[in-house]
A protein has these predicted regions:
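HTH-adjacent hinge/linker in prokaryotic transcriptional regulators
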Residues: 3-11, 15-17, 21-84, 93-103, ...
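Conserved phosphate- and dinucleotide-binding cores of soluble alpha/beta proteins
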Residues: 4-13, 18-20, 62, 110-178
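Short glycine-rich, flexible loops that bind phosphorylated cofactors or substrates
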Residues: 32, 89, 163-164
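Short beta-strand segments
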Residues: 83, 106, 156-157
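Phosphate- and divalent-cation-binding pockets in alpha/beta enzyme and binding domains
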Residues: 89-91, 113-114
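Short internal beta-strands
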Residues: 103-110
Length: 178
């Protein structure tokens, strides 16, 4: 609802979902703690679409389905590289729920922090120029670091797809990192 409305009142959510406002407030508190929304007096606002926390909420169900499908490829003991992005963050989170022994290499400080404490995975964070909103490392140092690893799978995110031109990314520095 928030992805289409951008701002919604607690009372509207409670009525629409058929639950109490207390339940809605608890759920909104949990979403705010994850950085997905901001609570303001009597309503909730989705975080900026440039912010990774806010992007997770956009098309959440579709991204979660993609993450579950991608998880089916991964086996215990695999070394995988996960590029930054909201779908990739959900993939990393899903992996923590379904696997116990993985090595995850990422250029995303957000992903490293997002799964920290949820697993005993070895997490390798690649270095580079830090982009604060997306919490990702970019630039030639990332490319240099990547060349030092062999992985079983490499998962990347994309901002769009067109059948004529293929995949696209609105951030050239992020696109060049992978």
């Amino acid at each position: 609802l928030l992805t289409s409305e951008k701002r919604i009142e607690v009372s509207q959510l409670a009525e629409y979902l058929g639950v109490s406002q207390v339940t809605i407030r608890k759920d909104l508190d949990a979403l705010e703690a994850k950085g997905i929304i901001k609570r303001e007096h009597g309503h909730a606002v989705l975080c900026s679409t440039d912010d990774i926390n806010g992007r997770i909420a956009y098309h959440y169900e579709e991204k979660k389905k993609i993450a579950l499908k991608a998880t089916e490829l991964v086996n215990e003991g695999d070394t995988i590289m996960i590029e930054s992005g909201s779908c990739c963050a959900l993939l990393a989170d899903t992996l923590t729920q379904l696997h116990k022994d993985l090595t995850i290499i990422t250029n995303s400080a957000f992903i490293a922090e997002y799964i920290r404490g949820k697993s005993n995975f070895q997490i390798i964070l690649l270095g580079g120029i830090y982009q604060q909103d997306s919490q990702v490392m970019v630039g030639p140092m990332v490319q240099e670091c990547v060349s030092n690893f062999f992985v079983d799978y490499f998962f990347i995110g994309t901002d769009g797809y067109d059948s004529r031109i293929g995949f696209s990314n609105r951030d050239q520095m992020r696109a060049q990192a992978v």
